[in-house]
Amino acid sequence: MTEPGRAESAAALAQCPRLAAGEPFDFVCAGCGDCCRNRRDLVLSGYDLYRIARRLGLPPRLTADAFCKQEFAPQTLLPAVVLRPNARTGNCPFFEADACTIHAARPLACALYPLGQAIDPATAAMEYYVQLPLCGTRVPAQEQRTLQNYLDDAAITARAGIDARWAVVCTQLSDKLQQAGGRENPRYLPAARRIARALYFDYSIQDDFYPQFNANTQALWPLLDKML
């Protein structure tokens, strides 16, 4: 059963109501922190990790080693960085004293809540779905808040281009690994580790993310051609 506010798959998300940018959306975060508790499914993008690392003043790899676990997604075959829950509480490692300690740099999934986002890997078009929230309040109807207002306030619009490009590149990399035989290819693990460097770790927090992401992925493709 899908937990409220946390669709378990793209198929589950597609069953939720879809919302256009100009449609009313009156959800307001109440600051209760319920969405931060027992959160074990939060996969980070490279941009998410970079933003957290920059907020902490640490290199991305050190940030991942301290707060995340690394795995290889069974369906996409791609490396994934997942927030590791606090061993004592089971909550997000950045949830302390009933507040997010990295709120300005919170991951996309947190900023979206209770929305789900789907990105078309061919066109980079984004769609948003309303999931059943665990909490929150509602703004008065006369304020006429829309989905676009919510996205703007949560700084999701400002990062949309990076998130779309991330989705497109990850789909292309997944296809590359699948076509090369996936885990049956003896060079899969070295290739996947090299992909992890390009997507997550080979970044300076003193420089902007997107130019580094483009440079990393452009250098990655010829390497994968040789490795696979």
Report residues per predicted region.
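Short loop/turn segments that flank or connect secondary-structure elements
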Residues: 1-228
